[in-house]
Amino acid sequence: MAEFFPEIPKVQFEGKESTNPLAFKFYDPEEIIDGKPLKDHLKFSVAFWHTFVNEGRDPFGDPTADRPWNRYTDPMDKAFARVDALFEFCEKLNIEYFCFHDRDIAPEGKTLRETNKILDKVVERIKERMKDSNVKLLWGTANLFSHPRYMHGAATTCSADVFAYAAAQVKKALEITKELGGEGYVFWGGREGYETLLNTDLGFELENLARFLRMAVDYAKRIGFTGQFLIEPKPKEPTKHQYDFDVATAYAFLKSHGLDEYFKFNIEANHATLAGHTFQHELRMARILGKLGSIDANQGDLLLGWDTDQFPTNVYDTTLAMYEVIKAGGFTKGGLNFDAKVRRASYKVEDLFIGHIAGMDTFALGFKVAYKLVKDGVLDKFIEEKYRSFREGIGRDIVEGKVDFEKLEEYIIDKETIELPSGKQEYLESLINSYIVKTILELR
């Protein structure tokens, strides 16, 4: 089989002193940490849409990407070429997982029946390639946002026919995700929301969204799909106000409709910042709710108001992200999927590799720093001391439900002073910096 990236060698770990852009500096996939290889802690995944479908187009300019599969003019030939390129790409980067939307991997036909037949052919190609590879499917999903039929939404559309089409599309996407051994299935509601309340029945749309998700849960049970269902929150873009705004909003929705036991969250860094949160905030919320499922790894540009999907290169952010993952017990049916694209001017094939290497190194280093933070317990000790007043005396009585407003008033009414601990934010932020530097210095 012809190579798509003949000029790119298999990427190796060369250590922190390496200046080779096509080598890992911090990510050694076989390095054992806490009893298992680093690759199993991180579970890196390639996003099919950004890596093999994105062409560098933007609202102001034509495609710029120079991609070897673009020499194919027949849509099916191009689809098969992209699949073959995926496996070569993953194997050269030592990435064991990939994710896709149904419409990423196969073109649409004139009817859903025809589209499904086309999709089946591409799935067969993927299955054939899987036989000779260790590359696996992390999660699948359906594209319910690109086609004009979804202009009013999919599960929240005003058209019963569109609702039916979306349901049938998810049905098929669930089937192929199961067929390919996917560990999870993602629901992202890019068109599930509104532009204005003047033409929106908000209550009805939310009820229909719940009906849709309940149907998906029921169908997954009927076909024996045991993968993890994941909601991917995002506050806006492409829709002005999206119903899965953030973890707290989406969890409240799931809880109020009795769906919370079936779903966890796929947290994307750039979506968190669009919602006015830090990446760590969304991960922490998901963790304390017991709903941290998977991560879409990227970063945004805080000076811009849209989802830039850049490769993650901020070690401070990845440290705090992996801190939450480790505290949650690590990934089970989830991982780190690079929902990231090279910049429009980074148009060469090697840039695809360099971008992934940068992200993998950044998360590997972040994991190593976070592991030391968790192991040393420095943040836990500080937080424990900060809330010490609730482990003794009146604080303990509050926690144990032994007091009410009257008793608390009686306790406090004659106290002249209250002593408070310092938050020491500056110290803790500098402590993270120290751990990052210390970790780098200790690496070979």
Swiss-Prot record:
Keyword Metal-binding: yes
Cofactor: Co(2+)
EC number: 5.3.1.5
Summary of pH dependence: Optimum pH is 7.1.
InterPro entries in UniProt: Xyl_isomerase-like_sf, Xyl_isomerase-like_TIM-brl, Xylose_isom_bac, Xylose_isomerase
Keyword Isomerase among UniProt keywords: yes
Comment on activity versus temperature: Optimum temperature is above 95 degrees Celsius. Extremely thermostable.
Superkingdom per UniProt: Bacteria
Chief localisation class: cytoplasm
Family of this protein: Belongs to the xylose isomerase family.
Protein name: Xylose isomerase
Species in which this protein is naturally found: Thermotoga neapolitana
Gene transcribed to yield this protein: xylA
